[in-house]
């Protein structure tokens, strides 16, 4: 089960143009976003560790998003 709240995910889907969003779609979207966010977070943490830092900085997140 996703830790991300479903309501903001539903708002994102509506912002993208959906008129209505089922509860199941909102939950599945939240789970998918969480998986994507965790992968970015893992890469960011790895980059911070590689730089011998405990703190994840914005440049780590930007680099993780780049690839």
Swiss-Prot record:
This protein's UniProt keywords: Chromosome, Cytoplasm, DNA-binding
Superkingdom: Archaea
Site residues by UniProt (Interaction with DNA): 14
Location within or outside the cell: Cytoplasm; Chromosome
The keyword Ligase is annotated on this UniProt entry: no
Region (Interaction with DNA): 20-22, 54-57
InterPro entries (UniProt xref): Archaeal_histone_HMF, CBFA_NFYB_domain, Histone-fold, HmfB-like
One Pfam family matching this protein: CBFD_NFYB_HMF
One Gene Ontology cellular component annotation held by this UniProt entry: chromosome
GO molecular function (one): DNA binding
NCBIfam families cross-referenced by the UniProt entry: archaea_histone
Quaternary structure annotation from Swiss-Prot or TrEMBL: Homodimer or heterodimer with another histone. Dimers then assemble into higher oligomers, with the DNA wrapped around the protein core.
UniProt-recorded name of the protein: Probable archaeal histone 3
Organism name: Methanocaldococcus jannaschii (strain ATCC 43067 / DSM 2661 / JAL-1 / JCM 10045 / NBRC 100440)
Lineage of producing organism: Archaea, Methanobacteriati, Methanobacteriota, Methanomada group, Methanococci
């Amino acid at each position: 089960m996703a830790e991300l709240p479903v309501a903001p995910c539903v708002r994102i889907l509506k912002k993208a143009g959906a008129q209505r969003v089922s509860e199941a779609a909102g939950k599945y979207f939240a789970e998918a976003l969480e998986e994507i966010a965790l992968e970015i977070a893992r890469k960011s943490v790895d980059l911070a560790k590689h730089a011998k830092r405990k703190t994840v900085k914005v440049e780590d997140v930007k680099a993780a998003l780049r690839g």
